[in-house]
Amino acid sequence: MSVCEVKARKGLIRVKVVIDEDRIANVSITGDFIVLPEDSVFEAESRLIGVRATESEVRAALASALSGASMTGVTVDDFVDAVMCAVRGEKG
């Protein structure tokens, strides 16, 4: 499991990810960011499972999951950066 933390404009995004055969097998997104409804984060995690661990596929899954969410001080790009940082095994 790789973990990465990314500082967004207003919050910290922490991602834990497990990669199996170039696909996301498990992912956890936590932190002190504001995304409403809160279920949007769970939806993002669900949509990432099974996705190929490439920036384009991660971006598509997150953009779809978070499209209806209200985000304060964080963006889809911030979430993509955090997931890809964890995928690469960086610390942030």
Report each predicted region and the residues it spans.
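Generic structural signal for short, solvent-exposed loop/turn connectors between secondary structure elements
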Residues: 1-2, 21-22, 54-57, 69
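C-terminal structural segments of small proteins and small subunits
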Residues: 64-92
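A hydrophobic, small-residue-rich beta->alpha segment in the mid-to-C-terminal subdomain
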Residues: 24-62
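Generic hydrophobic/packing signal
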Residues: 9-12, 62, 76
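Solvent-exposed, flexible loop/coil residues
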Residues: 10, 37-39, 78
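Structured beta-strand/loop patches that form or line metal/cofactor-binding pockets in enzymes
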Residues: 1-23
